[in-house]
A protein has these predicted regions:
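Alpha/beta-hydrolase superfamily serine-hydrolase fold, recognizing
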Residues: 2-183
Length: 183
């Protein structure tokens, strides 16, 4: 159902690339939007001289996992169809929750034997819903996004505790997924 997706397209003044990027905004899956990331995505499109599409995916806590992932998958398929290009020519990019969503989409497509995107650029992605990695514990206090705050964001997204075992949700699980080139 592509009719429910809101996707904003960015075209640079001088398009010098056939590259198409699908961008996912950050915000812990709870806050932010295409609008909050508008200036950043314009800058990205301008500097790369490439077309960028920014997706307004459904936010938690009203919309639990995997609804944002479903939105992302619908978006990449729509962009592919509308531009008559294979998904393998579309790159993904996202920051924070958006970085998680990009990696989650690549993992989902790999595990289901769907065509993979060309590449993914993950900017400080959320990866560990358990929030118990060495660095997460070591830097759990004294920073804006400390361990307790991150746990809160993950809990807003989780439909159940079973999400921890889902490799499209918990990116610290090594599922033998073949992933695209990653930066």
């Amino acid at each position: 159902d592509w009719g429910r997706l809101m996707i904003r397209e960015y075209l640079p003044e001088k398009l010098q690339s056939n590259t198409i990027i699908l961008y996912f905004h950050g915000g812990g899956y709870v806050v932010s939007s295409v609008n909050t990331h508008d200036a950043w995505v314009k800058l990205l499109s301008s500097h790369l001289k490439a077309r960028v599409f920014s997706l307004e995916y459904r936010l938690a806590p009203e919309n639990k996992f995997p609804l944002a992932l479903e939105d992302a998958n619908s978006a990449i398929e729509w962009i592919s169809k509308e531009n008559n290009i294979p998904i393998s020519e579309i790159s993904l990019c996202g920051d924070s929750a958006g970085g998680h969503l990009a990696a989650s989409l690549s993992t989902y497509r790999s595990l289901n034997n769907f065509e993979l995107p060309h590449s993914q650029c993950l900017i400080y992605p959320m990866t560990d819903p358990l929030c118990n990695s060495k660095s997460q514990v070591e830097f759990s206090k004294g920073f804006f996004l400390g361990q307790n705050f991150m746990i809160w964001f993950w809990k807003q997204l989780m439909a159940s505790d079973n999400n921890h075992a889902d490799p499209t949700f918990n990116l610290t699980i090594d599922p033998d997924a073949a992933l695209p080139k990653t930066l």
